[in-house]
Every structure is written in C-alpha cells, then in structure tokens.
Curated annotation (Swiss-Prot):
Keyword Cell cycle: yes
Chain's role: Transcriptional regulator which plays a central role in the regulation of cell division. Controls expression of the gene encoding the cell division protein FtsZ1, and of genes linked to other metabolic and regulatory processes, including synthesis of signaling molecules and protein degradation. Acts by binding to the promoter region upstream of the target genes. Is probably part of a regulatory network that controls the cell division apparatus and other downstream gene products in response to several conditions or stresses and via other transcription regulators.
Any Gene Ontology biological process: cell division
Gene source species: Haloferax volcanii (strain ATCC 29605 / DSM 3757 / JCM 8879 / NBRC 14742 / NCIMB 2012 / VKM B-1768 / DS2)
GO MF term set: DNA binding
Family: Belongs to the CdrS family.
Cited InterPro entries: Arc_rbn_hlx_hlx (IPR013321), CopG (IPR002145), Ribbon_hlx_hlx (IPR010985)
GO-annotated cellular components: cytoplasm
Protein name: Transcriptional regulator CdrS
Keywords: Cell cycle, Cell division, Cytoplasm, DNA-binding, Transcription, Transcription regulation
Coiled-coil residue spans: none
Reported induction: Part of the cdrS-ftsZ2 operon.
Keyword Cell cycle part of the UniProt annotation: yes
Amino acid sequence: MERVTLRIPKQQIEEVERMVETGEFPNRSEAIRSAVRDMLNEQVTDKRQRESTSKRGWAKV
C-alpha cells in the first residue's frame, strides 16, 4: 500500500474524527480509504452510464 500525504480542512478532519470516535471506522486512514473507494466507484458507474446512453440511437423504421 502506498503512503499519501494530503491536507484536509480542519472542519472535515474533525468530522472524520467523529466518525472514528463513534465507531463508524476503526481509524482516520480507513475512513479516507473508504471515501476514495466510494468516489472511484461512483466515477466508474457514471462513466458506464454515459457510455451506455451514448450508444443508444434512433430506431430504424
């Protein structure tokens, strides 16, 4: 696993900390990994939907 260093606004990291404290995630790293996974999955889904829509055409009569 690669290490990545990033800056996150204080308000957002405080929200991540609350999620860890309430047991939603075991630690901050896992919370951030989960957010990245969700974002990537959403991007892939959106791309597939756009590709599917662009392949549709008018029915030949």
